[in-house]
């Protein structure tokens, strides 16, 4: 490799210019490198979601989940399939092997699902999407107003705030949640309908095509052809009242009055109302909207945060008087603090390295020449990060910090050898060439050996590879850059800046004096003494080394282990789950009690609560219904997140009748231990779940143990009597349609009225039932006349599971435990020991998953990478 120095010395100015250009280019591109806490994680997961309002979990599983699972079974690369069936919704998650082309996988899944669409219930349209951590909001805002209603506020947010936020570099999408839309509700009068000879079905048929534009041919002449279309949007909701729902009867009526068309206003009332609430959002106790920003490819959480905070005053002004715009959660500050903290530590490491160089080289010129390799090598590594689209995060910055102490080694070796030959009286050019030639092989082999330690990590697959490949790449590039710098830039700088021997000096005298000075140096004298003693007691030294190695290996087992530690942050989360089947009002009342606790804590700067699912990434898989409330808690700048979490947990534990409360951090998913229980017998699975929860509940290593075993919720079942229902022309499908219309009405159209879109809802025309007895008493209109529901069907109130979960087609329950501390490895060991002595019902098996499975797989792969690194070093 000494040929590099020969070329550099022959073209010194060109070499210096090239590396100055490298520094300038680095200064231009490094600020654009995105900043994150952790690297982007491209999870190999394709999700399928489907909605079928009103269907029970059992029906969803049978009619939607099972056909979808069968349809995608032939897609290549699927490792595991999980599905959850809930009231009116199905979710299927397909886990592929890491390295799978998700674009191709998604296309295959879409094709498979489209083929199965014909077997699904009418109106069910599955949606396929690729899961990604970039779809998680990087920043969330809350918007409230004391002067505007929700619709007006939402309109201003969508027209004035969202477009401005979408212009921020790195923002992928801005979503607004919490808005209750408006519906046009048509409520028929049964008596007037009967007098006009109409039915609800006839009314529905008249409303269904309303507002559509239809082609009516063309008008042409010799010069042009003009198309004709009929229909268009309504100007106002009241225009509906003039809709003709039945033409005039020919010849007039029996009373001699002139016949006239039947207008909608003659048989029904038309009102504009808010859509039924399926979720509520409040910020600091006030009704609000949520605005979530997701980060696109190449985006930076820190940059997005800075830009949003800069725009907040203008955005508040754009919303108008009385509007409040608040940042609820923001990953930017924690990312910025993590990055800046590592930058400071890296800078301190660089300073310490320079001081050590001064101590040993005892020359300011030599120190400056050697120290040049540090920023130059790191800049080259950062340029590669930028070129690869990687980010500055705790792992890549940690890699740069590690590299600081190593990148200068090659330069010191080369520089010290050049300086030694200059001390021998050798001419400057010859001293540089000889000094580099003597150590080039050693420096190259040493650096390549060190790089070889990190290369196997780049071959690791899975989540570990996603996390540590940027780390190993950064270290490897920095060290290779240091090798190139030591063999090119350092010789040139040494030629220019190191003091040459005096002209006419006696080389032999200089060599003798230099060698004598080396022998009498304090470091060499002490080292030679230690070396002699070690060689005189070779066996003792070897035994000491072996004992030290074995002791180190033994002590490693005493270390705490965790997968991805908690980065802290300035946000907490609170999840509140009430009994299944709890209504929105019950959950709202319980959430208000939690809000009272939050508002009384000085450590809490702001909070937002969402009851039900407000949409966004993960909503499909969260299972959040109106019996669940989720809180985002922004802490005050001087608050201690860990202490505040403990205090909040203590305060909430004192509440009664508010459901199950869980306090967590606002960072990525917590380190939870999960136990998967699998079995075909629901009763055995339920019994096994109780046994496992009881076995783990008392373990000191665990803080909280829960399960996703679906609790029972009230459900009304209607079972048709084939004989009696058949006399009235009622099949199961017809009965479901008639009962559904009587219970909740139906959306028959979506209209554009003015600039807004409204769902057109046809009410049943009677009071909506609120109890099982009222459902039994429903009067159904059939072709054979009116009949009570309980005369043609059996109506029962039963308890039914609120959800059904399957893994690879088998019913599964997951027991989740939160470690009491940071040692997730110890928590997993305690769980294994506890469950090894538990007898589960026949047919039920358990397996450890969650963070422990991830951690074990990570340690296994990194262990193999370490073994491969040792093998490469020994080659």
Language model: regions and residue ranges:
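Membrane-proximal extracytoplasmic
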Residues: 1-347, 392, 466, 801-816
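Signature of alpha-helical transmembrane segments and their immediate interfacial
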Residues: 1-35, 439, 510-564
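Hydrophobic, glycine/alanine-rich multi-pass transmembrane helices and their short helix-loop junctions
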Residues: 27, 355-360, 380-392, 444-490, ...
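Hydrophobic transmembrane alpha-helices and their membrane-interface caps
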Residues: 29, 323-324, 352-359, 364-419, ...
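Membrane-water interface of transmembrane alpha-helices in multipass transporters/channels
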Residues: 36-42, 363-373, 386-403, 459-477, ...
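C-terminal transmembrane helical bundles of large multi-pass transporters
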Residues: 331, 657-875
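Juxtamembrane segments of multi-pass membrane proteins
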Residues: 525-528, 536-654, 659-660, 671-674
């Amino acid at each position: 490799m000494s040929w590099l120095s020969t070329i550099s010395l022959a073209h010194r100015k060109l070499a210096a210019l090239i590396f100055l250009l490298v520094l300038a280019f680095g200064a231009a591109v490094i600020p654009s490198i995105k900043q994150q806490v952790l690297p982007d994680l491209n999870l190999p997961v394709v999700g399928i979601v489907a909605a079928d309002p009103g269907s029970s979990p059992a029906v969803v599983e049978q009619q939607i989940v099972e056909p979808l699972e069968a349809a995608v079974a032939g897609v290549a690369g699927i490792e595991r399939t999980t599905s959850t069936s809930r009231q009116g919704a199905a979710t299927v998650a397909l886990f592929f092997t890491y390295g799978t082309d998700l674009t191709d996988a998604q296309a295959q899944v879409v094709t498979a699902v489209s083929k199965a669409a014909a077997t699904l219930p009418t109106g069910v349209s599955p949606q396929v999407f690729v899961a990604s951590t970039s779809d998680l909001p990087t920043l969330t805002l809350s918007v409230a107003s004391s002067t505007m209603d929700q619709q007006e506020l939402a309109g201003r947010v969508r027209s004035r705030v969202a477009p401005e936020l979408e212009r921020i570099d790195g923002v992928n999408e801005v979503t607004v949640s919490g808005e209750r839309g408006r519906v046009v509700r048509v409520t028929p009068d049964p008596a007037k309908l009967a007098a006009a000879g109409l039915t609800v079905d006839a009314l529905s048929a008249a409303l269904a095509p309303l507002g559509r534009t239809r082609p009516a041919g063309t008008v042409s002449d010799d010069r042009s052809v003009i198309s004709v279309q009929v229909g268009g949007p309504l100007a106002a909701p009241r225009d509906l009242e003039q809709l003709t729902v039945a033409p005039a009867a020919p010849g007039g009526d029996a009373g001699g009055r002139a016949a006239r068309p039947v207008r909608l206003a003659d048989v029904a009332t038309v009102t504009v109302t808010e859509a039924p609430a399926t979720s509520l959002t409040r910020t600091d106790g006030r009704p609000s909207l949520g605005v979530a920003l997701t980060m696109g490819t190449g985006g930076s959480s820190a940059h997005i945060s800075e830009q949003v905070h800069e725009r907040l005053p203008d955005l508040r002004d754009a919303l108008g008087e009385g509007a409040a715009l608040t940042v609820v959660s923001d990953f930017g500050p924690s990312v910025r603090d993590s990055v800046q903290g590592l930058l400071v530590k890296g800078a301190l490491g660089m300073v310490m390295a320079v001081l050590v160089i001064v101590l040993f080289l005892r020359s300011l010129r030599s120190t400056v020449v050697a120290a040049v390799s540090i920023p130059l090598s790191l800049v080259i590594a950062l340029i590669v990060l930028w070129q690869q689209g990687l980010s500055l995060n705790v792992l890549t910055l940690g890699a740069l910090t590690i590299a600081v102490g190593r990148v200068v080694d090659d330069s010191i070796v080369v520089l010290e050898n050049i300086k030694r030959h200059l001390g021998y009286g050798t001419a400057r050019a010859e001293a540089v060439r000889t000094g580099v030639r003597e150590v080039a092989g050693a420096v190259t082999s040493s650096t390549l050996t060190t790089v070889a330690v990190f290369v196997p990590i780049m071959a690791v697959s899975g989540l570990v590879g996603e996390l540590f490949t940027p780390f190993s790449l950064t270290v490897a590039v920095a060290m290779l850059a240091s090798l190139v710098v030591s063999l090119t830039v350092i010789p040139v700088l040494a030629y220019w800046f190191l003091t040459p021997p005096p002209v006419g000096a006696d080389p032999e005298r200089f060599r003798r004096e230099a060698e004598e000075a080396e022998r009498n140096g304090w470091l060499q004298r002490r080292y030679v003494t230690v070396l002699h003693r070690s060689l005189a007691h070779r066996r003792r030294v070897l035994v000491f080394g072996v004992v030290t190695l074995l002791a180190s290996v033994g002590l490693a087992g005493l270390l705490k282990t965790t997968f991805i530690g908690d980065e802290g942050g300035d946000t907490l989360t609170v999840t509140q789950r009430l009994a299944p089947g709890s209504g929105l009002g019950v959950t709202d009342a319980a959430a208000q009690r939690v809000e009272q606790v939050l508002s009384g804590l000085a450590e809490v700067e702001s909070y937002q609560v969402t009851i039900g699912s407000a949409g966004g990434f993960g909503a499909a898989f969260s299972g959040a219904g109106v019996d669940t409330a989720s809180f985002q808690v922004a802490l005050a700048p001087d608050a201690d997140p860990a202490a505040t979490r403990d205090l909040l947990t203590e305060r909430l534990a004192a509440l009664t009748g508010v459901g199950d409360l869980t306090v967590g951090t606002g960072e990525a998913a917590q380190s939870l231990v999960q136990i998967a229980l699998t079995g075909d017998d629901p009763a055995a699975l339920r019994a096994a779940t109780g046994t496992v929860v009881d076995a783990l509940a008392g373990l000191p290593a665990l803080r909280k143990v829960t399960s996703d075993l679906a609790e029972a919720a009230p459900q009304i079942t209607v079972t048709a009597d084939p004989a009696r229902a058949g006399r009235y022309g009622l099949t199961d499908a017809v009965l479901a349609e008639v009962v559904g219309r009587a219970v909740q009405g139906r959306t028959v159209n979506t209209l554009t009225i003015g600039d807004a879109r409204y769902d057109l809802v046809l009410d049943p025309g009677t009071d909506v039932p609120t109890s099982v007895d009222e459902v039994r008493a429903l009067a159904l209109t059939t072709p054979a006349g009116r009949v009570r529901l309980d005369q043609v069907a059996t109506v029962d109130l039963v308890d039914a599971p609120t959800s059904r979960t399957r893994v690879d087609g088998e019913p599964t329950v997951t027991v989740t435990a939160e470690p009491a501390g940071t040692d997730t490895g110890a928590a997993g060991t305690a769980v294994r020991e506890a469950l090894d002595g538990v007898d589960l019902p026949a047919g039920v098996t358990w397996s450890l998953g969650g963070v422990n499975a991830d951690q074990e797989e990570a340690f296994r792969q990194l262990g193999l990478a370490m073994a491969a690194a040792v093998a490469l070093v020994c080659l």
